[in-house]
Amino acid sequence: LGTGEDAFRQIFGDTNFSFIAGGVKFVCLNTNAMEYDYSEPIPDFDYIERQLTERADEFNKTVFCMHARPLCDQFNMAKVFQMYVRQFPGLQFCTVAHEHRISASDVFDDGVMYYGSNCMKNRSYLVFTIKPDGYDYEVVEF
């Protein structure tokens, strides 16, 4: 149909966005490179770079959220992406969902964890608790 991005923007807004809650910056990114014809950068490194300094005095921890994880078929420039991600203060973890299964993986063997969530038809989701000295997560099945 070719209207996926238009529908997404109409319902949710920008495909890249961030917010800060409790001193944690959540950077939410479009990583579905195969959905585009290379007319725009996916992931958008200029956007990621701006997030490093934008409102920098308001956060000391960072979480990245995306659909496709680095090194999967949908993701471009994985190693460059990881270099950017590692620059952020107090990087906690990254969340992904493209594979529709629960997973926990240190994709680059550098200590940065990527947690995959299931699809709703499999009736589970992840809950993260970010603490002063780290974080916990649990799988909730319903």
Regions found by a protein language model. Give the residues of each.
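Short, solvent-exposed aromatic-acidic interface loops
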Residues: 65, 138-142
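Sequence context surrounding c-type heme c attachment/ligation sites in exported
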Residues: 77
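Short, solvent-exposed loop/turn segments at secondary-structure junctions
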Residues: 72-74
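Histidine-centered divalent metal-coordination motifs
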Residues: 67, 97-100
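Active-site segments of SGNH/GDSL-like serine hydrolases
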Residues: 60-70
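Extended active-site neighborhood of metal-dependent phosphoesterases/phosphodiesterases
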Residues: 1-61, 80-93, 101-138
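A generic structural motif
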Residues: 95-98, 142
